[in-house]
Amino acid sequence: IGFTADLGDKVIPNIVGVDIGCGMLTTQIPTDVGTIDFKNLDEVIRNNVPAGRNVCDEIINFEELEELHCFHQLKNIEWIRRSLGTLGGGNHFIEVDTDSKGTNYLVIHTGSRNLGKQVAEIYQKIAIEDMQGTDKLETEIQKLVKKYKHSGRRKEIQNGIDELKRKWKPDKLGIPKELCYLTGEHRKQYLHDMKICQEFARINRRCIQSAIFYTMNWTLQRNTWFDTIHNYIDHDTNIVRKGAISAKYGEKVLIPMNMRDGCIIAVGKGNEDWNCSAPHGAGRIMSRSKAKENISLEEFKESMDGIYTTSVQKSTIDESPMAYKPPQEIIDNIKDTVEIVDIIKPIYNFKASE
């Protein structure tokens, strides 16, 4: 799964999507931890990492939020601030995996939460308005205001604006609203705000990492973690990656397959034919609704045998391994873009459930 392209001097917010900067933070768990008490870990996560629609009780400061060009259009700012350190739902997860040498890893998959969603929707609306010629209407309004002020007709300004809006007819789009794009200053503003959302998502994962390591009394050692992100535009190359990750030469990446079969740790080959990219995950073979119709809870439970999880429930059937493409299909199709180092297997999994 995944899409990559150089969109040139245009950008379509909908292609990047609503979960800007979503990704996986992979952290090596210290070897001196020994056998992990998964019951305790599960309680720690449930008590310290809000999931689903839940947010934190306390606000974690994120000063860059007010640097967003669209800041004043955001709704429920406090809710956004309280979203740092939260997992969310859907395919987001927290997992402990073990590699072929017995080393354990904590993997956290989450993104920019409601902030990314709002920013994406704000800029897609701007893209639609721009392509409908709303900027021309704004220019006419500015001319009218200047003219009326100059001629001492201030009291007539509002009526004049209302009349312009009444007569204005939007340009025909010629393309679906979902594919409307930004250019010029609005493109620059979106890229700026998208980068802030990416940072929000990165810090969100780090907050979860810190909460788990601190509460479990694990030592967080330097240079033992790496981030693999998707749903963004690479500022250096202008490549958009939707459901795709960077796989530049020598770059360490993580590609999750499903909650039973684990994740691929690989190193990028820098293949230009692939836009130096790789899929961010396995991709679904069943929609969420189809999975809930066709997969039984019993089948789901059997598929997760041997993995500690309290998240296998009716509400999470749509995330069962059978809803995703077979691991071998992924392994066979990524060899041109990454070198597989290891496949880490899950021994603990947590997903939000109702």
Where do the protein language model's features map onto the residues?
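Long, basic N-terminal domains or extensions that often function
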Residues: T31, H69
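N-terminal glycine-rich flavin-associated loop
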Residues: T26-I29
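Acidic, glycine-rich loop-and-strand cores that form catalytic or ligand-binding grooves
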Residues: I60-N61
